[in-house]
């Protein structure tokens, strides 16, 4: 998901938290648990640079028609729960086609980044957070 207010720097070294290999192993475990074995998933460690200073934990790039996706994880996690971020991004991937279809319908009537569009995006994010907590069996976020 590209965004005009940020830059993504690829091919960076992991600064702290789980190693890139540890994240990949965790991704494979969750890929099986989430029944995403038909997806070709990869993981990249990146640095997110945002104009507003927001510290982003993760993101993804997906081609749902090919069932391919790359999960982007920050090189310098600060929340201490990379598993949560990883599963959160995987849930986004599962919802991505549905999300894009609904967003396209919304954008026929509303401007991108309008209050209505932002409400849609906020609601989507809350849904993904809620599903992530349920799947992980957590109530701490």
Language-model features: locations:
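Metalloprotease/metallohydrolase-associated module, dominated by Zn2+-dependent proteases
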Residues: 2-81, 97-141
């Amino acid at each position: 998901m590209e965004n005009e207010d940020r830059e993504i720097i690829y091919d960076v070294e992991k600064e702290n938290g789980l190693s890139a290999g540890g994240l990949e192993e965790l991704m494979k475990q969750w890929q099986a648990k989430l029944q995403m074995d038909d997806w070709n998933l990869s993981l990249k460690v990146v640095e997110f640079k945002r104009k507003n200073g927001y510290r982003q934990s993760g993101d993804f790039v997906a081609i749902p028609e090919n069932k391919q996706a790359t999960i982007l994880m920050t090189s310098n996690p600060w929340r201490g729960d990379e598993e949560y971020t990883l599963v959160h991004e995987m849930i986004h991937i599962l919802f991505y086609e549905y999300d894009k279809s609904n967003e396209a319908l919304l954008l026929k009537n509303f401007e991108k980044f309008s209050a209505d569009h932002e409400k849609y995006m906020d609601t989507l994010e809350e849904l993904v957070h809620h599903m992530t907590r349920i799947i992980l069996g957590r109530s701490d976020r």
